[in-house]
A protein has these predicted regions:
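Conserved catalytic core of the tyrosine transesterase superfamily
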Residues: 1-344
Length: 344
């Protein structure tokens, strides 16, 4: 849900904060919407714990309907550090959130409380000493080259009115290694077919240019032939991917599309694969199949730290075997042995 279309459902101070990070701090709109959702979950939790009798028969559907308009600054003043820890425990047990997801939600409310204290709307920041959970470094799931081709083949050969759009989406994920928010945010003006380039707005509103291969460029051009035309007065006029309602496609929409495409290609055998897995797949294939330099992959992915890129570069056992067999020391020993035989 967009924070812009929900302002009448929010307390004024929350709207001020969301506008501040969007228009002053220049966060991407998709990032602000994610932060808004994180804060909204926390506000609903506050209301639920304050009115335990009203919400004793807890259901997820009931939780989603809790209005946050009446969360006052006085209620926020009552928030203590132990309540933040209890909230994180709630996220873990009730929402089954991973450490990574809990940390993201904690980061959202930490920054919110920091702003509230900095602007003198609150006298105390209860999150200041709350620590982030330790995240186990697990290798993300990914598809093989053959499986990637199978996914694209099944997607383009599906009889659906959105087949061409869906194919372009999956093609971009696998070839350009984009984050979900980056794909959703692509505008028509970001694409230059004559230069085969795509301008991406990534985390922290940072922009980067990536190059399109022929397959990806063709998939986008084919989609543009069937993409609905919007009037220039429409706020989504410039959006590349549109939903059936002729609005900029949402993150959830893309997730559902990818889930359906994966199901068609693999039934339920790839139920652990999601949109971020496709980004990971693209980076892994670049490294293993095309021998792409890790520094190049870092630029394509938009990572600031090389350590963030390293998790995307699986080296297969076969590849490792080839490297070890072809290592410099091995070849020197072989040459030496060969020369000794010649002398004999």
């Amino acid at each position: 849900m967009s924070f812009l279309s929900s302002q009448d459902k929010n307390p004024d101070y929350l709207n001020f904060y969301l506008k501040y990070i969007r228009y002053i701090s220049l966060y991407a709109e998709t990032t602000v919407n994610e932060i808004y959702n994180d804060i909204r979950i926390f506000f609903r939790y506050l209301i639920m714990t304050k009115n335990k009798d009203a919400y004793k028969d807890f259901t997820m559907e009931m939780f989603k309907e809790i209005p946050i308009k009446d969360v006052t600054i006085s209620m926020l003043e009552e928030v203590k550090p132990y309540m933040i820890n209890e909230y994180l425990y709630f996220l873990r047990c009730t929402f089954n959130n991973s450490a990574k997801t809990r940390n993201r939600k904690l980061s959202s409310i930490k920054n919110f409380f920091k702003y509230m204290e900095k602007t003198n709307l609150l006298s105390f920041n209860p999150t200041i000493h709350i620590e982030f959970a330790k995240e186990g470094k697990r290798l993300p799931k990914h598809l093989t080259l053959l499986e990637s081709k199978q996914l694209l083949s099944k997607t383009i050969n599906t009889s659906s009115r959105n087949t061409i759009r869906d194919y372009a989406i999956e093609c971009i994920f696998l070839n350009c290694c984009l984050r979900l928010s980056e794909l959703v945010g692509i505008n028509l003006t970001d694409i230059k077919f004559d230069e085969q380039t795509l301008k991406i707005t990534g985390k922290g509103n940072k922009q980067r240019i990536i190059y399109l291969n022929d397959a990806t460029s063709e998939s986008i051009q084919e989609y543009l032939k069937v993409r609905p035309t919007l009037p220039k007065t429409n706020k989504d006029y410039n959006a590349l991917f549109l939903s059936e309602r002729k609005k900029r496609i949402s993150r959830r929409n893309v997730q559902v599309i990818t889930e359906k495409c994966l199901k068609k290609a693999f039934n339920d055998s790839k139920d652990k694969i999601h949109t971020h897995s496709l980004r990971h797949t693209g980076a892994t294939l670049m490294h293993n199949e095309n021998n792409a330099n890790i520094l190049i992959i870092q630029k394509i992915l938009g990572h600031e730290q090389l350590s963030s890129t390293e998790i995307y570069t699986h080296v297969t056992n076969q590849k490792m075997k080839e490297i070890m067999n072809n290592c410099t020391i091995s070849s020197i020993l072989e040459k030496r042995e060969a020369s000794s035989n010649e002398e004999k």
